[in-house]
Structure formats: C-alpha cells, structure tokens
C-alpha cells in the first residue's frame, strides 16, 4: 500500500513506534511497536505467523510456542481483528525471503500483544481480492476500502489533490469556498432542492457548479480562484459519472485570454502526469481541434485520438450518381461520409451484420459498405455503383486490397454522430496503448444551433460564453455561423471539462440573448444579479473545471468512477451503507411545512 503521511517520529505513541511497510534490515535487533489489522494468520507446527497490515503495508509477525499466553490470545482472533504488538525485528532466513513486499527481508518476534478490537466473520475477504458483488462492496464500504487496490486509489486521490493545490497556489491562485446552499437555476441538469424551515414554501438548491459565484469573485477583484468543489446534479449514473455528487477542480481567472488558460491547465496536467503516473502524454502542447473538424473526422466532440480511424467526406464523388441513396444526399446540409477499415475486407457476414445492427441502434437505416477483394469490389451496394465511382473511392481513400469502406449518408450532424458511433464500435478491434494520454482541446464551438422541435435559434452550449467577434459578430453574421470562446478538454475519449471565456459585457449579453429570442426583461429576471454585477465593472475573465473523479480514473486506469470515490452511491443513486435516501418523520416534514404526494406504488411507504 502507499506510504502513510508524516514520519515515524511524527506518529509515535503508545500504539506504534514504526509502520509495518517501512520496516527493513536497517531495523534488525531493534524493539518496535506496531499496530494494525490481522491480514492473514497461519499456524505452522506450533508457530503462529501473522501478516499485520497498516496503511503502509504488511509486516510478518511470529508468535513463538513458548509464549503460551500470547499464543492462546492470538489463536482465537479472526482476521481483520485490530492488535497492537511489541517485538524485535530479525532478518528472515534466505528460504523465507518475500520479495513481493517492502518488509519481506525481516520479521518481528512478538513479545506482547494487545487486542484492541475483535473482528467477527466478514461478509467478504479483505486479503484476497476475490470477485465480490458491487452491492455487497458498497454496503460494507468501510471493509472494501481496506482492500489494497481501492485503498491505493483513495490515497492517490488525496495526493493528487495536494499536488493540484500546490501547483495552483504557485501560479497565483487562491482557494476560496463558495456556498453549498444557493438558488435553484432552471438551466442545466435537475437540481437537488432543500426546503427552508424559516421561509415556508421556499427552497435552496445544492449547486450544480459554483459557476456564478466564481464569476462574481472575478468581479470582486480576486485575480485567480480555485476550489476542490463539490457539485450536485440529480442525474443518472454512468461508468464515468457518479449520480448525485462529484468533485471538480474549479478554476477562474481575470484578465486572461483563451491561450493563457490553456497554458495553465496543460502545465497542471503535465505536472500531475509526470509526478504521479507512469503514463505519458502523446503531444505537448495539446493539439487544438475545432468542433467542426472533430465532427467531420471523428464524429464526436470527445474523440479518442488513439483510435487509428478517421472519416472522410466523399459527397462530391456521388453528385449525379445513379445510386439514389447517395445522390440525394449531395445537396447543401447533407453529406456522405466514408471510413476505411484496413485489412477487414474478408471478414465473415456476421462481422458486417453486427456492425449494421450497431448502426441501427445509433439511428441509421442501415450501414452500407464495399469490400475491396482480390476478385474485385463486393458488398450489398456494389451493384448500384459505377466502376468510375468505385475507382474514385479507391484513389481518394487510398484503399488497398483486403480493406473495407463503410458509408453514412444524410444530414450532416446526424450522419457524423452515427459514423462516430461506428468508429467507437470498431475501436475494440485495436490494441490501444493504455499508458498513452492523448489530450486535446476542442475549440470553436458554435454559439447557436437551430432547434428543430421549436423551429427557432437557441444557444448550443453555454449562453454566457463570449462570442468570437463580440458585438460585431452578433450584428453582422448569420447566427448559426457565430463561434464562441468555448472549449472542452478531452483525454482518450473522456471529456474532462468544459470551459469558456465569459461574456462580461451586459450589452453583448443582452444582444446574444435577443438573437435567441429572450427579451431584456426576461434576461434581467433570470440573471439580474449577474447583469447588475457586470454593470458595476467586470474584468474579462474565463475558467474551466476539470472533473477530479474522472482525472483520477484516467491516471489510475480505472473504468468505473466508483473505484476512485471513498463512499459512492450505486447506480440507482442510493447509499447502501448509510441507507440513503431514507424516510423522515411526519414531525420533520411538518417543521418544513411539507406534505408528501407520492406515486401510487410508493404511497404505502409514507412515513408514519
């Protein structure tokens, strides 16, 4: 396990003089006091061997048969009982050396044992990391956290937070705490609401992010802010998203431009990677790719750049084609995308059927493909394509014999996303380097999008981002062509964070909202406190907030976010260990002036 904080001297007391994992041959013949949990216990012909575990690792103890009182005391103990011992460090014999643990060259001959806590039979073993159901692990999380792998994850997380603080403080940032009880916002995800006892009928909300507070700190004259910020969103769980709450490294800076922020965050991520991981960053500074570019090439705004697959636009090759499916998608707003899979042109029919099934799940009517075989092009659509079109495709896409090319056709955005999903589906065919961190910035997001359902223009992402070109762009450009100073940081297909250079000018803000159909009065009603603050002198500012949990996941090579959180909820947003959420009494509800209006199937569970 990872080393405990502090030194031996710092933590000496009646329980311990040393840590288990730090003992070595330098301590030979020295008296030591150790304390911890019984990891394993073995009786070998009258000798009892105990692997004693503390936060730093394991030390082997020996209870000799002549110590009858100690022998009987220890013999009755279950694993995971807590003991404090005193004894003498001795070298192990050559045949008993254990190179798998740092203390494997020594053992401790025990003179005294104090039993601090008796452990009952356990619901699952700690010493052997056997497959255990997640439900059981989360119910007994305090036990699960003793297991080496997850214990190290939490230690790593603590050390990473410490390094983040050090880096940001060295770069002029101040750590400032923002409120946990705040106002509900109609934007974004669903809020967690907290009823007010003192103000009947009114509610606080737990913050989805400290967004407005950190911007107001810039208005208050603090140049650089950060916080290891808890955020609360009532949303469903995913492998890389914890339901309910998560933590982010929340940052904001005044008097900066986009490049300044990129330099700070890239430096921090490189520092963390180099000091805490054996992984390597593929390219530094991180490449910057426009939203339009990544959608055209990868079909996703969070691409895994390790996957050696790219889409290419072949729309112009099929203008006037006799294949109507392609010809009808050569007009403005539509496209034909092609993606070559090298060396897969001779796969079985099942291979292509599975790929087509995935395409249908993504919303496509099917998945067209052409196999370039020794005997010539094959596949379901070959009969509809001319020899000239097949040759032009082969030349444009550098197709070789044995390759297969897949196609998507339709409206640009939908087609890109479907083909991006197919790219992700095929990524399992490649042996990706798990030690490679392929960071990139996604920039130049559109400020607006056209809402097909509402038949109107609306903001595509963050309405408070500064438009590129500022007021001039809003007054002179087609709204759908206006780009925002908004950016995402992505690593290996995982979005770590979104950020933006903020719109700090009320006149530009009113105009931006006007284009999206919001009146000045409506903007004032929704965001009046922010507008008022900006009217009193707001500096140019911007920020970002990388997800702490996701960052630890990436650096620790974990695929499940619950493996890097000490006490996570399950996928149904339940804390199985604390039995939350739980019923509350009628008295508690009455104090908050609340009555329950439960769905029929749960009404019988109303608290009595």
Curated annotation (Swiss-Prot):
SUPFAM superfamilies: Class II aaRS and biotin synthetases, GAD domain-like, Nucleic acid-binding proteins
Amino acids binding L-aspartate: 187, 233, 461, 502
This protein's UniProt keywords: Aminoacyl-tRNA synthetase, ATP-binding, Cytoplasm, Ligase, Nucleotide-binding, Protein biosynthesis
UniProt-listed GO biological process terms: aspartyl-tRNA aminoacylation
Predominant place of localization: cytoplasm
Keyword Transcription appears in the UniProt entry: no
A Pfam family matched in the record: tRNA-synt_2
Top-level EC class as recorded in UniProt: ligase
Binding site for ATP: 233-235, 495, 547-550
Subcellular localization(s) per the UniProt record: Cytoplasm
Site (Important for tRNA non-discrimination): 44
Any one of the GO CC terms: cytoplasm
EC number: 6.1.1.23
UniProt keyword Aminoacyl-tRNA synthetase, yes or no: yes
Reactions mediated catalytically: tRNA(Asx) + L-aspartate + ATP = L-aspartyl-tRNA(Asx) + AMP + diphosphate
Region (Aspartate): 211-214
GO molecular function terms noted in the UniProt entry: aspartate-tRNA ligase activity; aspartate-tRNA(Asn) ligase activity; ATP binding; nucleic acid binding
Function: Aspartyl-tRNA synthetase with relaxed tRNA specificity since it is able to aspartylate not only its cognate tRNA(Asp) but also tRNA(Asn). Reaction proceeds in two steps: L-aspartate is first activated by ATP to form Asp-AMP and then transferred to the acceptor end of tRNA(Asp/Asn).
Subunit composition and interactions: Homodimer.
Similarity section: Belongs to the class-II aminoacyl-tRNA synthetase family. Type 1 subfamily.
Name assigned to this protein: Aspartate--tRNA(Asp/Asn) ligase
């Amino acid at each position: 396990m990872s080393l405990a904080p502090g030194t031996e001297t710092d933590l000496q007391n009646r329980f311990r003089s040393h840590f288990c994992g730090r003992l070595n041959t330098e301590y030979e013949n020295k008296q030591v006091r150790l304390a911890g949990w019984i990891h394993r216990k073995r009786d070998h012909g009258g000798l009892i061997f105990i692997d004693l575990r503390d936060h730093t690792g394991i030390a082997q103890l020996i209870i000799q048969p002549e110590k009858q009182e100690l022998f009987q005391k220890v013999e009755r103990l279950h694993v995971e009982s807590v003991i404090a011992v005193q004894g003498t460090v001795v070298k192990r014999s050559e045949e008993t050396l254990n190179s798998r643990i740092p203390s494997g060259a020594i053992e401790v001959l025990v003179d005294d044992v104090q039993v601090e806590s008796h452990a009952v039979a356990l619901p699952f073993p700690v010493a052997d990391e056997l497959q255990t159901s997640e439900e059981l692990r989360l119910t007994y999380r305090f036990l699960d956290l003793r297991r080496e792998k997850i214990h190290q994850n939490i230690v790593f997380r603590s050390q990473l937070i410490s390094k983040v603080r050090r880096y940001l403080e060295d770069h002029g940032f101040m750590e400032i705490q923002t409120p946990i009880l705040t106002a509900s916002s109609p934007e974004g995800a669903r809020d967690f609401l907290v009823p007010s006892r003192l103000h009947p009928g009114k509610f606080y909300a737990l913050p989805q992010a400290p967004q407005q507070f950190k911007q107001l700190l810039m208005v208050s004259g603090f140049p650089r802010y950060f916080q290891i910020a808890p955020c609360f969103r009532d949303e469903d769980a995913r492998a890389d998203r914890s339901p309910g709450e998560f933590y982010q490294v929340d940052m904001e800076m005044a008097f900066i431009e986009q490049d300044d922020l990129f330099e700070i965050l890239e430096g921090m991520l490189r520092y963390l990677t180099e000091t805490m991981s054996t992984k390597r960053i593929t390219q530094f500074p991180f490449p910057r790719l426009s939203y339009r570019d990544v959608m055209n090439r990868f079909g996703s705004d969070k691409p895994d750049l390790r996957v050696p697959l790219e889409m290419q636009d072949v729309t112009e090759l099929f203008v006037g084609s006799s294949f109507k499916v392609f010809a009808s998608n050569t007009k403005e707003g539509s496209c034909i995308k092609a993606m070559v899979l090298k060396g897969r042109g001779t796969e079985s029919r099942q291979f292509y059927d599975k790929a087509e099934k995935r395409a249908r799940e993504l919303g496509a009517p099917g998945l067209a493909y052409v196999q370039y075989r020794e005997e010539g092009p094959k596949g379901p659509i070959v009969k509809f394509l001319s020899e000239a079109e097949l040759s032009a495709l082969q030349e444009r896409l550098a197709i070789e014999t044995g390759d297969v090319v897949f196609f998507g056709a339709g409206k640009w955005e939908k087609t890109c996303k479907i083909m991006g999903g197919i790219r992700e589906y095929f990524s399992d065919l490649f042996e990706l380097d798990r030690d490679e961190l392929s960071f990139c910035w996604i920039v130049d997001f559109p400020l607006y999008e056209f809402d097909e359902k509402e038949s109107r223009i609306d903001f595509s992402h963050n309405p408070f981002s500064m438009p590129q070109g500022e007021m001039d762009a809003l007054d002179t450009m087609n709204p759908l062509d206006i780009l925002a100073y908004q950016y995402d940081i992505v690593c290996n297909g995982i979005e770590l964070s979104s950020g933006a250079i903020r719109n700090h000018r009320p006149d530009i803000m009113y105009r931006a909202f006007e284009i999206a159909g919001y009146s000045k009065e409506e903007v004032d009603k929704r965001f009046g406190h922010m507008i008022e603050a900006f009217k009193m002198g707001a500096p140019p500012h911007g920020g970002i907030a990388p997800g702490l949990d996701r960052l630890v996941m990436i650096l620790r090579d974990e695929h499940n976010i619950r493996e890097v959180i000490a006490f996570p909820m399950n996928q149904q947003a339940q804390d199985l260990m604390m039995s939350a959420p739980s019923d509350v009494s009628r008295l508690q509800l009455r104090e908050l002036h609340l009555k329950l209006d439960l769905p029929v199937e749960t009404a019988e569970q109303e608290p009595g």
